[in-house]
Amino acid sequence: MASNNVAQFAAELKMPAGVLLEQLQAAGVQKASEDDALSEADKARLLDHLRKSHGATDGDKRKITLTRKHTSEIKQSDATGKARTIQVEVRKKRTFVKRDDVAEGAEQGQAQVAEADDDAELKRREEEARREAELLEKQAQELRERQERLEREEAERRAREEAAEAERRRAEEEAAAKRAAAAAVEAQQAAAQQAAEAQQETAGAQSAQDEARAAAERAAQREAAKKAEDAAREAADKTRAEQEEIRKRREAAEAEARAIREMMNTPRKAVVKAVEPPKPVEPPKPVEAKGTLHKPAKPAGAGAARPAVKKPAGAAPATTQAPAGAGDRNKKPGGGKGGWQDDAAKRRGIKTRGDSSGGVDRGWRGGPKGRGRHQDSASTFQAPTEPIVREVHVPETVSVADLAHKMSIKASEVIKVMMKMGQMVTINQVLDQETAMIVVEELGHRAVAAKLDDPEALLVEGEATTDAEQLPRPPVVTVMGHVDHGKTSLLDHIRRAKVAAGEAGGITQHIGAYHVETPRGVITFLDTPGHEAFTAMRARGAKATDIVVLVVAADDGVMPQTKEAIAHAKAGGVPIVVAINKIDKPEANPDRVKQELVAEGVVPEEYGGDSPFVPVSAKTGVGIDDLLENVLLQAEVLELKAPIEAPAKGIVIEAKLDKGKGPVATILVQSGTLNRGDVVLAGSAYGRVRAMLDENGKPTKEAGPSIPVEIQGLSEVPGAGEEVIVLPDERKAREIALFRQGKFRDVKLAKQQAAKLESMLEQMGEGEVQNLPLIIKADVQGSQEALVQSLLKLSTDEVRVQIVHSAVGGISENDVNLATASKAVIIGFNTRADAQARKLAESNGIDIRYYNIIYDAVDEVKAAMSGMLAPEKREVITGMVEVRQVFKVPKIGTVAGCMVTDGIVKRSSSVRVLRNNVVIFTGELESLKRFKDDVKEVKQGFECGMSVKNFNDVIEGDQFEVFEVTEVARTL
């Protein structure tokens, strides 16, 4: 958009128009206002002026910055054959400054040298990446060779096992053959012995020779069998040892292969810059790789042969370059860590079976079940071996997590100690000081009871140091009186706005703050409700006020809330100006009003008192000027002063939760100046003032003493009547607010009336007490507390009002869920439920009642409580009967012949037996007959027969008093 005037050009430059006018005048361009036209020549003059003022002689550009980015890719494949791409990105930034012609040649030479250096750097880095890829390829080739070697060893092992098995079978066959041969020899010997016995005489010498030879053969056979068994046993032991050795080697090789695969799959760190080009190192031979094959705890297997790569900034390496002998320098089995391996791989390490590495290079979990934890790092830091005894300052209350943090241990350790002490706790559970100190001592530290750090003391110190000039301020006037006496209408005439028409039912239910400018000065008015329910609001109004205007209707006189307003004013020591309203009515009687006020201790000036009485009419405007004159006169007498150039202090008049704006508070500034952007503290709420509106809804940047404003930006809805303080920083405000929240947490929990064991026992002792649970949501804080107090006053010994929850804002789903759990009725005072809450309430059958007049809410709750009362039982005497004769009837009992002397007797009635006018029995009629016929009722003057249930001691002359019990509904 073209800028044709000063205002548009300032908006385009995003600067205040006043500053732009000053710069134009300094440049010699005469512009008087924001609407003056602005030409291109004027803009050029302004630009030249600004350049000269900032030291620029001409508009030529003498510096230019060039940025260049070069990206290259390197492809490689890992051990699994999966292709991976490594991207190398080089960024260059060059700034050229125009100098004299003499230095241009040298500058060009330096630029060419720098570009040549960059090209050499790029080539060197590409060479490093290529060498890394070659190294990875060599490792993959080495892995394949190891796998082939393992396969060959496995085949050799199987062949040896088969040969051993064949040898064992052959030995068994030989042993069996030898045993068979021995048996045959023994049979031959037996036969020969028999033959020898037959030919003993002729062949004695021959048989002796044969016997000696057989014994020698048997000895030889036993020796051979023993040797064969020993050989078979040795072969089996050797085979088992070889199998165990092969199994161990296979497991070690598999663990190493798994570690190499993890190493290959781990993302590498990008190469940034090396200190000097690495020297090519030959990879280790497979035969010499004993450390990696037999000690599987080594993570990489070729870490000593890898070139060092510089880590990113902030991670200082142990050495800038790892030569071939770097692994021997640390004297650790298995060599050192690879320089290119990232921190995650270092932390993981390699998990192996057993502890074959001697527990040296095992990472964090080297041994079984985490034994021998330590980290093999190249840094020189050594963890302390002795326990550190700390001095722990324990506050009055501390959570388990905070206590563990103070001792620099995990919260689980504190929970373990508490469990050993027999107490089950969670990480967020709060411990008292005594328990926390016992836990600290149990863990071997020194516990010191910390002093209570009360941040409230900072506020007192801040007040003591504040010293500002006291300047006059406008008076704060509170309009008080009985309901419907015309307070708001009177203020409405003063403000010339229709406020009373906007209140539901024509009665004020909110406290309003307005300031009015008169010819003699500014007056701030606080309009308070007159209904009896709003006692707390009137008390807050009297607390913040300087002068009270007591409005009394001339036709109504002094009423209960008028007396209460007088009591509030006297308690606060505030002067009273009496406005006798409605003098335009024919039935007005100002003299009677004066007499009634004198009886209450408010004496008019004409009677020698100190309270001016002004007759006014809010309808016609009569006496309004005199009323303002008297108010300002009282203010002059009081000499009201307050510091202006100081941090603001005030009081929360009203607070509410707006759906679009969040927490909104109406604040009356009592001293200092409140600016937009200040950090305020109101009770347990804090925040920065995001927006500030006056009573008419217009934005304002600041508010001085006695000025009411509406602020936004608080963390929560503050309580009405809370003191508002401006603090220098938000951190201190948050600290004090959290301290106050923790300090009053017990009070807040007590208000929720949780079902504790003690309260349950009390209710059991009280008997059956009906409860009416309610959830109250109001538009502002004052209305909410007024409604709560009014409903709580309705409680009786039989029916009790239970406020489950009360808050400011609309009715939400959480409120409906709470009502479902507590079986409560939701009351919305000038608020509504959103769509989700209404739908949930309909599905759960929750009753939501909306009110905008406090009368209606109180009356309906009162009616509901009346319906919960037990009905009252009343006795109504319906007749009197005289016994004339008594009959004894078998199987029935005594039957009295009676005469109805008064009223009527019904069969369903109850009866009292009177003898000599003394009640001797109370019961029910069992039968009612007339001439042997059962009848429902007998009227006066007729005879009848009657029998009383469970009573036979009837004599002549007794009287029966017949009555009925009726239930009557009770009301509160």
From Swiss-Prot:
Chief subcellular location: cytoplasm
Residue stretches of biased makeup (Pro residues): 277-286
Swiss-Prot/TrEMBL keywords: Cytoplasm, GTP-binding, Initiation factor, Nucleotide-binding, Protein biosynthesis
Coiled coil: none
Chain residue ranges for the region called G4: 581-584
Bias-annotated ranges (Basic and acidic residues): 49-63, 121-177, 210-261
Segments of skewed composition (Gly residues): 356-369
Keyword Glycoprotein: no
Sequence ranges assigned to domain tr-type G in this UniProt record: 472-641
Location within or outside the cell: Cytoplasm
Pfam families to which the protein is assigned, alphabetical: EF-G_D2 (PF22042), GTP_EFTU (PF00009), IF-2 (PF11987), IF2_assoc (PF08364), IF2_N (PF04760)
Region (G3) location: 527-530
GO molecular function: GTP binding; GTPase activity; translation initiation factor activity
Biased composition annotated in UniProt, kind: Low complexity: 105-114, 178-209, 298-327
Keyword Zinc annotated: no
Region: G1, residue numbers: 481-488
GO-annotated cellular components: cytosol
Region (G5): 617-619
Residues involved in GTP binding: 481-488, 527-531, 581-584
Residue ranges, annotated region (Disordered): 49-86, 100-383
Region (G2): 506-510
Role, per record: One of the essential components for the initiation of protein synthesis. Protects formylmethionyl-tRNA from spontaneous hydrolysis and promotes its binding to the 30S ribosomal subunits. Also involved in the hydrolysis of GTP during the formation of the 70S ribosomal complex.
Family label: Belongs to the TRAFAC class translation factor GTPase superfamily. Classic translation factor GTPase family. IF-2 subfamily.
Protein name (record): Translation initiation factor IF-2
